[in-house]
Design a protein with these regions (language model features):
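S-adenosyl-L-methionine
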Residues: 1-92, 101, 119-168
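Short beta-strand element of Class I
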Residues: 113-119
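Conserved Class I SAM-dependent methyltransferase catalytic core
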Residues: 199-245
């Protein structure tokens, strides 16, 4: 689906247009948007304090943004937590498909985690990550967020060129919806708006670069990424995590 940058107040016009130029998107004033058809599009709504993504701009549309303060308290992924067992004290991690940063936060919440590098190639999504980190001011959240560093770059390109070592590399190539269950708004937005990641060679490269393991998130019925069989899998009702040990 198509994404536009929008703004509500005339005083925000210049900042919104500058962002649209940076993102390579069209900028629209909210008052000029056709209310009958705007649910067919997504809007990056510029606000100086917290920007967001919305599908449509009507009253039923809801803000989508990086809410680390809420996620640190109300979101847990016990399956992903199980995938981190056995990693060394002060392990370092790279999230090759950062998205909104929710899974990276779960990794950072592990007491043994020292740092997480979030790699995100979409410029608008990288901007939301930056804002989410800047707005996380609660001490209970900062102890996790302070482990973050972020880069706006293609993950394959970064892994090919970096000299840094990572104990854990995490990959979540967004899989399409399966079955009748409705995806959460943030997940659906990623499916609709992010370009499909060219994963050819990414997993193989990650296995060579990681010092301990690579974790790949898949739908429970999906084939193995790059047809590479994992050492083992951690399975749930909807998703599974394939674990590849580095040699």
């Amino acid at each position: 689906m198509e994404l536009f940058v929008s703004y509500k107040l005339p005083k925000h016009e210049e900042a919104a247009f500058n962002l649209a130029k940076e993102f390579g998107l069209t900028c629209l004033f909210q008052g000029d948007i056709d209310k009958k058809e705007n649910n067919l599009f997504y809007f990056f709504v510029y606000k100086p304090d917290r920007s967001c993504i919305r599908r449509g701009s009507g009253n039923l549309s809801r803000d989508i943004y990086c809410n680390f303060s809420d996620w640190s308290v109300n979101f847990k992924d016990p399956l992903l937590s199980r995938c981190l067992k056995g990693l060394p004290e002060k392990f370092t991690a790279l999230d090759a498909t950062a998205g909104f940063g929710k899974d990276a936060l779960e990794i950072a919440k592990n007491k043994q985690c020292q740092s997480v590098l979030l790699v995100e190639r979409e410029k608008w999504l990288f901007y939301l990550l930056q804002e989410g980190i800047a707005n996380a001011e609660i001490p209970e959240v900062l102890k996790f967020i302070n482990k973050f560093s972020i880069k706006n770059v293609d993950s394959y390109e970064h892994l090919s060129n970096t000299k840094s070592n990572f104990d854990l590399i995490y990959i979540d190539p967004m899989f399409p919806g399966v079955g009748k269950s409705k995806a959460k708004r943030s997940i659906q937005a990623l499916r609709d708006l992010t370009k499909e990641i060219e994963t050819d060679g990414l997993l193989d490269l990650a296995i060579k670069k990681a010092t301990k393991r690579v974790v790949v998130k898949r739908h429970k019925n999906s084939t193995y990424l790059e047809d590479l069989k994992p050492n083992y899998s951690v399975k749930g009702k909807v998703v599974r995590y394939d674990i590849y040990n580095s040699s």
